[in-house]
Amino acid sequence: MKVVSNFIFTILLTLNLSAALEVVTSRIDRGGIQGFHGDVKVHSGATWAILGTTLCSFFGGLEVEKGASLFIKSDNGPVLALNVALSTLVRPVINNGVISLNSKSSTSFSNFDIGGSSFTNNGEIYLASSGLVKSTAYLYAREWTNNGLIVAYQNQKAAGNIAFGTAYQTITNNGQICLRHQDFVPATKIKGTGCVTADEDTWIKLGNTILSVEPTHNFYLKDSKSSLIVHAVSSNQTFTVHGFGNGNKLGLTLPLTGNRDHFRFEYYPDTGILQLRAAALPQYFKIGKGYDSKLFRIVNSRGLKNAVTYDGPVPNNEIPAVCLIPCTNGPSAPESESDLNTPTTSSIETSSYSSAATESSVVSESSSAVDSLTSSSLSSKSESSDVVSSTTNIESSSTAIETTMNSESSTDAGSSSISQSESSSTAITSSSETSSSESMSASSTTASNTSIETDSGIVSQSESSSNALSSTEQSITSSPGQSTIYVNSTVTSTITSCDENKCTEDVVTIFTTVPCSTDCVPTTGDIPMSTSYTQRTVTSTITNCDEVSCSQDVVTYTTNVPHTTVDATTTTTTSTGGDNSTGGNESGSNHGSGAGSNEGSQSGPNNGSGSGSEGGSNNGSGSGSDSGSNNGSGSGSNNGSGSGSNNGSGSGSGSTEGSEGGSGSNEGSNHGSNEGSGSGSGSQTGSGSGSNNGSGSGSQSGSGSGSQSGSESGSNSGSNEGSNPGAGNGSNEGSGQGSGNGSEAGSGQGSGPNNGSGSGHNDGSGSGSNQGSNPGAGSGSGSESGSNAGSHSGSNEGAKTDSIEGFHTESKPGFNTGAHTDATVTGNSVANPVTTSTESDTTISVTVSITSYMTGFDGKPKPFTTVDVIPVPHSMPSNTTDSSSSVPTIDTNENGSSIVTGGKSILFGLIVSMVVLFM
């Protein structure tokens, strides 16, 4: 059955194709729907008009002979539009006469869809719609050639689309294609010597990255509102453009941006080429010579600063003859049988508008109803150098055009260049020699112009000015009193260009470096100066749409700007003397937080069992045996929650190292409370060793481990040990340790075993006020160990816990582990950097040199490690906080000195070295 069905279908198709329609005499057909099966041929001299139709379909090939006409028109009122479909994959479409499809009277959507196995136009094709709504016109075929005239127009602009050929194939245009109120986005390669004329706000977008346009093909911007846009992300091409001026636009699909070697756009007067650049992606437009570079400026064309306009008349109006073929509305369709007797076809005496057509003169539009397109070839002879002139006169009100051409002229395709005069109403005369001399004059006039800065950008007119910003990448080098400044501008843009329904995205990065030099005067003797920079970042999001979709683009602009130089070096040094307790306070407070919990759990028993008479002075400069367990409970919470400074300042006879313990006590004050409250092992260890210390160790146990527990619990494990050792000896320790450590942990210590066993966290974090008042009287015999432990907890706690949070390291007897740490900050260490804009941020570049010392058995400090770190300059947008950043910053203490905070990786090498030495 299926075989029979296929056989019947084949027979019917053969009958339809064989039923060809031959239009030999003129005729008019009327009706809403028209359908024609088989090939249709309109013979020469015949006119066929199909009127009052809304749908006209052809199922076969179409041929209109020379001297014949085919009119299809919708005149059914403003609602019903014209739809014409001619789609055959096996038969050609050939036009040598006139084809006119007209839907201008309709207010609804019209569609012209004509295609075949091949498309050839040697005559005239007119496609007209109202433009009230978006209409489409497609002339497609794999083999597509136009040697005649195609006019596609709308009464007004409504984003109508027109397309030629088959996507990703090649169309050949040797004739004239006129577009009015249209959007033309070809999806094919274009070759030939023809012209596409954009008029009445027509927008042409050559938008495919893999398709090319031959330089011999011409684009003519006829009015001031038309635009030609080229896809930026594409291979470099040169597009031949005529009529650029009076405000029309040439552009790219990306914003125009320069780089270190080129400006955003450059005009070369010697060649007449305009270069547009989206960073590293240039495109070239051959617009002609004689333009004034001061009249170029950057504007928008359905994008963000992506086009250039020229605020002046077209200086060189040499337009090829093929671009001057009149873009008329075409002949009118016959309305009655009587109109069929009136000739309505145009006369085209040259069969091709290829290179031969460019050798012919061009006539202007006739004002009569019968359009006459006549051209006569010039009788130039290749073997003669004589100048031959040809004049063609057209009857009625047509314009006479005189063309003079040298047969040996080097103009493209041997065609005469027609230079339109300003009057443009009577005669159009050209001479290649005259235009050449004018171009040379214009070139000599503009060649002297160097780079010009306008409100929209910098324009380069000569090669000398284009290299003005070329420079080599160098780093910033500084010496006392002088700095070399480099302005490094980086622009990274992600742009999305959108029409109504469709968007595309592109990414562009541009770099520019400009060196200069400044002299700086030091504010003090040998303090060098450094240059601060302000970095400004602007981010914008752009949404564009086309007919299909929308998309967004993000554009980020970053610029570094140099400012007034300021003091660059600040050094903070803490020595081993007891007077330098401030340095210890700063170091300790920063580092105690990480190690508290670890130290607390381990130092609890040490404080409890080892701080007899000697350990008392370590942690609180309190009484000997009485402060043994108070050392554990009292110094724990005191050190942890806030009595680091008391520890240092109140140590008994160990004032020298106690002051360094003071530096450690500040570490303890910040971190002890945190660690004490969180260390579970502190309560266990404290309860066991605290009671031992208090009852059994007394003065002996204090002297044995006082130095160790002082160092460990002094700053780090204070809060944990406070609650733990208190369980055994809390009441005793509380009375002895109070003045040194117990400003905050006293309340827990006062209750002795109760707080110790159950309230380790409470003692560490919040019981300082009671303990502080009781322990003032207790100053024991632990002055020596107290001073050692103080110094150990002073800087050891600070240094170790700075980079290794929670890392536990025991001090070794005989070493003053409370040794000082020198921190030298070189760079822009400025409390108030100088800037010129409140919206800008300051980029700080620092060099951190950290030297740590330890005191040996001979009592002299000895450096054992030095770390120089040069971090990468970093800036954050203003009013933005990034707590996760590991980039070091410069903070200023209350006394005006500077310290390095953040950047945990900076001190990691230092701490590892210290741990290795201690082991």
Swiss-Prot record:
CC annotations in GO: cell surface; extracellular region; fungal-type cell wall; hyphal cell wall; side of membrane
UniProt-annotated glycosylation sites, renumbered to this chain: 236, 449, 488, 580, 585, 607, 619, 631, 639, 647, 693, 729, 741, 755, 879, 895
Swiss-Prot/TrEMBL keywords: Cell wall, Glycoprotein, GPI-anchor, Lipoprotein, Membrane, Secreted, Signal, Virulence
Signal peptide: 1-20
Composition skew (Polar residues), residue ranges: 393-414, 823-833
Record bears the keyword Nucleotidyltransferase: no
Main location: secreted
Keyword Chloroplast assigned: no
Main function: GPI-anchored hyphal cell wall protein required for hyphal growth and virulence. Involved in innate immune cell evasion through conferring resistance to neutrophil killing. Binds kininogen, the proteinaceous kinin precursor, and contributes to trigger the kinin-forming cascade on the cell surface. Production of kinins is often involved in the human host defense against microbial infections.
The protein's name in its UniProt record: Hyphally regulated cell wall protein 1
Organism: Candida albicans (strain SC5314 / ATCC MYA-2876)
